[in-house]
């Protein structure tokens, strides 16, 4: 099978895990005026990419994928604990848990998941997105680097979808923004691959505050 097909499958918005229903604080940033147009949206997404994802979320995901590929189950279990402890708000915790559960349900119904990975999933009754993504990459024979690229693209695509629903930003403007942000995806992937995952730490205060405020936002399009 062409390996590109598996990669496209993992990155597809049709993957039934519900990523489209979350904004990761962006809806609140639009509500309070921090993000009001394409330029401010670019700044918000760039900061999230390079200051949060590249330094913490992406290296953590990469470590999950590497441990799953090598069948290092004790290491993967440790990473699961670190991931769970790093969710700074209830919204982010529930988002990762719900998407991880949906991905677990998907993988359990597919023949590609091997017995060892299936047993590991059965032992972890509280799944999360990074774990599901790593085991999907293992099942579909996707390298950790490619799995990270798919995850970064999926994140960016979802953020742009949020913008088109909350701002007067059309599809062509979103595509122009995509062209501007693609080099940052490459930079985020490279930065993440150079970071030692032992230990990792995050200090994304702006994101945490936006997510906490979003939990109490009066009118919302996206889940909290």
Curated annotation (Swiss-Prot):
GO terms for cellular component: cytoplasm. It comes from the Bacteria. Keywords: Chaperone, Cytoplasm, Nickel insertion. UreD, UreF and UreG form a complex that acts as a GTP-hydrolysis-dependent molecular chaperone, activating the urease apoprotein by helping to assemble the nickel containing metallocenter of UreC. The UreE protein probably delivers the nickel. Pfam families: UreF. This is Urease accessory protein UreF. One of its GO terms (molecular function) is nickel cation binding. Required for maturation of urease via the functional incorporation of the urease nickel metallocenter. The keyword Protein transport does not apply. The keyword Methyltransferase does not apply. Belongs to the UreF family.
């Amino acid at each position: 099978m062409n390996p590109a097909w598996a990669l496209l499958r993992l990155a597809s918005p049709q993957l039934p895990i519900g990523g489209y229903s979350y904004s990761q604080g962006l809806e609140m940033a639009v509500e309070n005026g921090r993000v009001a147009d394409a330029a401010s949206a670019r700044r918000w997404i760039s900061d999230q990419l390079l200051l949060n994802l590249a330094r913490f979320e992406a290296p953590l995901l990469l470590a999950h994928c590497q441990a799953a590929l090598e069948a290092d189950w004790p290491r993967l279990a440790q990473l699961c604990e670190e991931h769970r402890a790093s969710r700074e708000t209830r919204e982010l915790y529930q988002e990762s848990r719900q998407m991880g559960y949906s991905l677990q349900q998907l993988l359990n119904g597919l023949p590609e998941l091997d017995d060892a990975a299936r047993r590991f999933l059965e032992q972890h009754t509280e799944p999360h997105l990074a774990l599901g993504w790593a085991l999907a990459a293992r099942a579909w024979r996707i390298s950790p680097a490619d799995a990270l690229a798919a995850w970064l693209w999926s994140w960016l695509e979802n953020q742009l979808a949020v913008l088109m629903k909350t701002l007067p930003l059309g599809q062509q403007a979103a595509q122009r923004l995509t062209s501007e942000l693609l080099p940052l995806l490459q930079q985020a992937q490279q930065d993440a691959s150079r970071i030692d995952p032992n230990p990792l730490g995050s200090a994304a205060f702006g994101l945490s505050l936006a997510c906490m405020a979003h939990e109490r936002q009066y009118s919302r399009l996206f889940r909290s």
